[in-house]
Amino acid sequence: LRLRHYIIIFLFVLTGCSADSAEAIKPDQSITDSITLTPVDLAQGETAKLRPFLGTMSGAFKLRYEGEKPSASLDMDIWENGVKVDSAGSIGDLFFSPEGQVNNSNEIEVIISIDTVRTEEDKEVGIVKISTGSGLATFTLPWNSELKGRGLIQNTETLTFTPDHPVHTFAMHATSSNQVFAGGFSEESLSKIEWALVFTLRFDE
């Protein structure tokens, strides 16, 4: 009878340990998908050696996702007099990793370079180059030669957000008055710009 009691107690202990183990490996459902944007100083670190090859208006930032890999695109939007008026291009599947890549990283570094050049027809055009780590894209845009003053709008601090709404990441604004004002990505700041090329992170549902 005493042996039977020991067997019952042992089974209770074993069952409890199994339950605890199952609970320990259960995925944490409280973790939410998020993306962190970290500004990169092009004058520091590894990117400094690229500086001579970049346009006069350049910037960089890192994007790191936590949770499920998002379906994200980096869109170029043209703004005039405080409102979006057109789309200038887009890079889809921003977190793409080449097939067979050993280190399937959840972080990418985006480098954007903007410059203007004159064509053989003596027309000024804008050249936009975007590197995402897995590839390099180049876009050519018409340019209004009356826009003389130019400036950059960048995030200066690390941001963390959820992939359920568009986020402005970088912009170059220009003015015909030759007066460039400091600004940010708030609605109030964007409403005051004469012209801008705004890079916006968007997510597919």
For the regions a language model picked out, list residue spans one by one:
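Residues in flexible loops and secondary-structure boundaries
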Residues: I9-L11, E120
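Residue-level detector of functional hotspots within protein domains
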Residues: L3, T47-K49, F185-E187
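Extracytoplasmic electrostatic interaction patches
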Residues: G89-E205
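C-terminal motif of bacterial Sec signal peptides marking the signal peptidase cleavage site
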Residues: V13-G16
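Short amphipathic alpha-helical segments
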Residues: H5, S18-D20, F199-E205
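Sec-dependent signal peptide recognition
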Residues: R2-I9
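Short N-terminal edge-element motif at the start of the domain
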Residues: D20-V83
